[in-house]
Curated annotation (Swiss-Prot):
It comes from the Bacteria. The keyword Signal applies. To P.multocida PM1509. This is Uncharacterized protein PM0015. Residues 1-19 form the signal peptide. Keywords: Signal.
Length: 207
């Protein structure tokens, strides 16, 4: 599988920039929601380097971005916001907690929810960055995955690529060894978790 370098940077840089800005300024009215479903939260010893702890998952900050809106969107609480994003052809979601951050793009030419509830599906591109040393955001591993998600079928055409930026050689080897064993499964779990944003939030009212 091949990923264009510029494509990687286009996903990775906004994620890291968002994480950095989030760490120094969080407004009181920022949209916040926890995605702590049983299939996405594991114990710390299962994947200690590449997974967040249940505690950090509970403190995940979520921001929805659509180029047609300048105001803050809150589809979890506002049905009109959910409908607007569901009828759009593209929107982005940024999620961040103490140990990881993610940038996800949802795309469907038919409209997000129409695509999701049909055989067309929704194209999901996700870049999730895991901070190997949480207090040091300069040491990280990023799992970039793409897939087509559908409401009543398993996700299709899943591909992923890992990106490492770890300066400590011993730590880098440990992370790479763990990624070799569990990276594909982690990418699949991330895609399924992003699918719940559609099924539980954006397209929950669509039959």
């Amino acid at each position: 599988m091949r990923f264009n370098v510029s494509f990687l940077l286009s996903l990775l840089l906004p994620t890291l920039a968002f994480a950095e800005s989030w760490s120094i300024r969080i407004s009181e009215d920022e949209v916040s929601r926890t995605y702590g479903y049983h299939d996405t939260v594991e114990s710390e010893h299962t994947m200690p380097l590449l997974e967040s702890s249940p505690k950090s998952e509970k403190n995940t900050k979520v921001t929805y971005v659509n180029r047609d809106f300048t105001r803050q969107l809150n589809p979890s609480a506002d049905e009109q916001d959910a409908k607007a994003l569901g009828s759009s052809i593209e929107f982005e979601v940024f999620q961040i907690n103490e140990t990881k951050s993610s940038h996800t793009i949802f795309e469907s030419g038919a409209g997000i929810c129409q695509g999701f509830h049909s055989r067309l599906g929704v194209e999901v591109t996700d870049a999730t960055t895991y901070y190997v040393i949480p207090v040091n955001k300069e040491e990280y591993y990023t799992n970039i995955a793409t897939a087509t998600v559908l409401s009543n079928e398993d996700s299709k055409n899943m591909q992923y690529v890992p990106v490492f930026y770890i300066q400590n050689p011993e730590l880098a080897k440990k992370v790479q060894d763990e990624e070799n064993k569990k990276g594909k499964n982690l990418a699949s779990k991330n895609i399924e978790n992003r699918k719940t944003i559609l099924s539980h939030v954006i397209c929950r009212k669509v039959i």
